[in-house]
């Protein structure tokens, strides 16, 4: 964390008056008010009083009000000779909004460009092909087509090439290593792997460095998502990496250095995954590689690992690794295309916070201090269609609470860090913070957008549960209550998202760019997404469904909402193109039929029309994006 926590010794009121906020206008309220100095206008006494009560004056408690509300307060009681100015300001605001919409629509186009680019994947297998590895070589060969098909189902723009590096050990005098250059042909890939005969390996360690040294000789495509899957059951030579008998205890006999290998991997922007078969033998090496990679890259890269001992589960692990890599690439490319690598508030290059992941969830919070936070929570809207209006103001409540936060995050995604914490009642919570330093990423609006999205999704879920009239509670859909914390008494504003800790196996059921999990357990959640579009009168759809299956149903978090109002719900709102991507993949199921849901038909010139269907809609939906 770049700012120190500051504890308050002051006794303060825990509750704040409730207020309202139009989240999409939060970036314009300060600009609008700064253009209108209350001190230079003829402000009636009654208006000054209202401003003071609402936090517009320099003193008193503050509540959050929207741009629209603020302008009403400032201009509502102005003298007759100032009405012309007010009209001009309204016209200016309308023009500014038009520009914002145009800009956002262009950003959505660039986001889809990033999605397409991220699905250009170069997948390289590096495999120990000594005597004990036959079952794993065979598994890769038999799974490669299934892997490709599974990826195609999730990524409509997939363009994947496969490569292979085979290595053995120094007792194999000739042909110790060999390569298969990247190719789209699974037939050629299978032919190469079929000709491999496992052999060699007189001592325990193998020529790992020799295999890794060939990575730079592969013909990586420019800007591709680059993934290395390294499968091995033995470490490299050099006693600092293991405790086995070693014919080359001083390390690689050809003088290959680990730092050079890892520098190549980092400079090539490779996502490296080590599939260990015998962690007892390779664990020390993997940990050493990971630590050194983080050191050289300044925590921008790491060596990931997974258990590949069971050959039947290996393909699933590889699939997940590729998924993670595509997600990271998509985020990076989106930033590049949109220019978000420059912090909008400072004009400086965006930089990551310094952090170290600690996956230990058994934390002793006893010695950690409580930190005072201002907690903001939105009230659930009373009506779905109304809350989707561009002028809708979310009702909010504020309260001062105390939280203990773990010093290190336990997980991270493409954009956020996740910290474990406990509240003043001893309840486990998760605090989420931007990975990046800077005003754009850490603005109150950014956090409020996420909270608004989850609150509106929760309203959809509540109404969905009522309409479905399910007899079993196992299908009930619930979103955790999202809140925003602002650290009190810190030098600079510091925000966190906060939710109840979800205990269980976390799953993703669909994404915000068209992928849907195709299994029986996720059917009800795909129906939920479909239903939200119809229930909103074709204005919005809740996607990016993820969370935990519990005995009471589905407990979900971090949704996205695609809305025809592209200024709402943050950067994950991909507007009408995002809605279309869902229906290109969605297949109606028994739950859709029970609710009488219909598949919309999209054209570039019309909004939506409906036609019933129970199979894929990709052939009937067309829209230019």
UniProtKB/Swiss-Prot annotation:
Free-text disruption phenotype from the record: Impaired development, multinucleation, fruiting body formation that is delayed by 36-48 hours during the development in addition to stalks and spores that are thin and smaller.
**GO biological process terms held by the UniProt record:** contractile vacuole discharge; contractile vacuole organization; hypotonic response; mitotic cytokinesis; myosin II filament organization; regulation of sorocarp development; sorocarp morphogenesis
Q: Which SUPFAM superfamilies match?
A: Protein kinase-like (PK-like) (SSF56112), vWA-like (SSF53300)
Q: Which residues form a coiled coil?
A: 87-114
Where in the sequence does UniProt note compositional bias of the Polar residues kind?
Answer: 25-39, 46-63
| Entry similarity comment | Belongs to the protein kinase superfamily. Alpha-type protein kinase family. ALPK subfamily.
Q: What is the protein's known function?
A: Displays a modest preference for threonine over serine residues. Does not phosphorylate myosin II, however can phosphorylate MBP, in vitro. May be involved in the regulation of myosin II function during cytokinesis. Overexpression leads to impaired cell proliferation in suspension culture and fails to develop beyond the mound stage. Both overexpression and absence of the gene can result in defects in cytokinesis and alterations in myosin II abundance and assembly.
Q: Subunit structure, briefly?
A: Interacts with calmodulin; in the presence of calcium.
The name on file for this protein is Alpha-protein kinase vwkA
Origin species, per record, is Dictyostelium discoideum (Social amoeba)
């Amino acid at each position: 964390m770049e700012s120190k926590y500051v504890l308050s010794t002051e006794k303060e009121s825990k509750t704040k008056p409730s207020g309202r906020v139009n989240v999409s206008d939060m970036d314009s309220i300060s600009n609008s008010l700064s253009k209108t100095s209350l001190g230079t206008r003829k402000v009636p006494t009654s208006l000054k009083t209202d401003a003071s009560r609402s936090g517009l004056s320099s003193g008193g408690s503050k509540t959050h009000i929207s741009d629209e509300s603020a302008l009403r307060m400032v201009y509502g009681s102005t003298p007759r000779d100032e009405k012309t100015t007010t009209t001009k300001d309204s016209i200016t605001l309308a023009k500014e909004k038009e520009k914002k919409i145009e800009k956002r629509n262009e950003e959505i186009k660039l986001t889809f460009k990033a999605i397409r680019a991220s699905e250009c994947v170069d997948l390289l297998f590096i495999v120990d092909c000594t005597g004990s590895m036959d079952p794993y070589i065979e598994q890769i060969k038999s799974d490669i087509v299934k892997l490709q098909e599974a990826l195609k189902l999730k990524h409509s723009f997939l363009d994947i090439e496969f490569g292979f590096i085979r290595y053995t050990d120094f007792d194999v005098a000739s042909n110790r290593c060999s390569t298969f250059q990247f190719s789209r042909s699974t037939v050629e890939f299978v032919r190469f792997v079929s000709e491999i005969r496992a052999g060699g390996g007189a001592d325990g360690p193998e020529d790992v460095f020799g295999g890794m040294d060939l990575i730079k000789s592969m013909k990586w495509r420019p800007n591709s998502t680059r993934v290395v899957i390294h499968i091995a059951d033995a470490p490299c030579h050099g006693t600092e990496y293991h405790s086995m008998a070693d014919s080359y205890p001083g390390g690689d006999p050809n003088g290959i250095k680990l730092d050079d290998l890892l520098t190549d991997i980092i400079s090539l922007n490779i996502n490296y995954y080590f599939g260990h078969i015998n962690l007892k033998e390779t664990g020390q090496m993997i940990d050493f590689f990971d630590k050194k990679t983080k050191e050289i890259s300044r925590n921008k890269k790491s060596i990931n690992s997974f258990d590949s001992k069971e050959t039947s589960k290996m393909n699933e692990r590889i699939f997940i690794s590729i998924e993670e890599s595509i997600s990271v690439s998509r985020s990076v490319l989106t930033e590049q295309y949109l220019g978000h690598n420059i912090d909008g508030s400072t004009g400086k290059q965006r930089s990551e916070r310094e952090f170290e992941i600690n996956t230990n969830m058994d934390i002793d919070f006893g010695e950690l201090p409580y930190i005072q936070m201002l907690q903001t929570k939105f009230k659930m809207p009373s009506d779905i269609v109304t809350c989707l209006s561009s002028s809708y103001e979310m009702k909010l409540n504020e309260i001062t609470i105390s939280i203990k936060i773990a010093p290190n995050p336990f997980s991270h995604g493409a954009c956020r860090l996740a910290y474990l914490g406990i509240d003043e009642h001893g309840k486990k919570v998760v605090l989420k913070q931007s990975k990046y330093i800077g005003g754009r990423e850490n603005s109150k609006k950014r956090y409020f957008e996420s909270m608004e999205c989850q609150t509106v999704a929760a309203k959809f879920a509540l109404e969905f549960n009522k309409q479905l009239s399910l007899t079993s509670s196992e299908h009930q859909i619930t979103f955790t209550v999202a809140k925003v914390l602002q650290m009190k008494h810190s030098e600079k504003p510091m925000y966190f998202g906060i939710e109840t800790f979800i205990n269980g196996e976390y799953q993703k059921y669909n994404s915000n760019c068209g992928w849907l999990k195709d299994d029986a357990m996720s059917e009800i959640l795909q129906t939920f997404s479909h239903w939200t579009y119809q229930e909103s009168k074709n204005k919005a759809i809740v996607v990016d469904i993820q969370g935990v299956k519990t005995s009471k149903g589905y407990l979900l978090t971090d949704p996205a909402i695609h809305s025809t109002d592209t200024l709402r719900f943050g950067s994950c709102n991909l507007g009408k193109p995002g809605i279309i991507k869902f229906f290109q993949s969605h297949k109606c199921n028994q739950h859709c039929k029970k609710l009488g849901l219909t598949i919309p038909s999209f054209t570039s010139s019309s909004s939506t029309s409906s036609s019933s269907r129970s199979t894929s809609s990709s052939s009937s939906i067309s829209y230019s994006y």
